[in-house]
Amino acid sequence: MSYLGVGLSPVNVAGTKMKLMDRKVRLTELILRCSVCALALVAAILIATDTQVKEIFTIQKKAKYTDMKALVFLVVVNGIAAAYSLLHMVRCVVGMMKGSVLFSKPLAWAIFSGDQAIAYLTVAGVAAAAQSAAFAKLGEPELQWMKICTIYGKFCNQVGEGIATALLASIGMVLISSISAFALFRLYGGNKAQQGSRW
């Protein structure tokens, strides 16, 4: 028994461990959301500001991200992911300040669904942009598509940096969606444990 007259019991210890784990999960989620917001914003800026002008036979041709629809999609998706992460960063900070650690099931479902949608969008954006970048770098001789990166080297390098940054943001979103899945299905796990203990 402690000096306050409150004895230690398995329930008290389990509750303390659960609160500590909840705090760590929330902090991890906040750090990941901050990282995704920053990385997605950097990726969108890198690609959207990328241009290069080359003179080919006295004709100036300007390469810009809007020339490849996959890059436009990647910029839009990263902008959405950055805004979504910023919104949830605020939710995480408010939740940590209030000290509320448990969600209602509808809110947990909404967060889980949103995180899944953004994770899928970011992965799709990176995949589409990587495929287009591979065509630009390697060309496609069967279709007589030439290698663009031999002409626009700086443009291709900056696009590559943007795609790599977007890949890191999409990995972060996949990790966040795993955390939201854990938070959602944990709400259902408690009921099963209580029902099982009745037997």
From Swiss-Prot:
GO cellular component: plasma membrane
Family, similarity comment: Belongs to the Casparian strip membrane proteins (CASP) family.
Record's keyword terms, sorted: Cell membrane, Membrane, Transmembrane, Transmembrane helix
Extracellular side: 48-69, 128-164
Signal peptide: none
Organism for this UniProt entry: Eutrema halophilum
Annotated protein name in UniProt: CASP-like protein 2B1
NCBIfam families: A_tha_TIGR01569
Topological domains, Cytoplasmic: 1-26, 91-106, 186-199
Parts of the chain that traverse the membrane: 27-47, 70-90, 107-127, 165-185
Subcellular location: Cell membrane
Assembly notes: Homodimer and heterodimers.
Domain of life: Eukaryota
Membrane topology of the entry: Multi-pass membrane protein
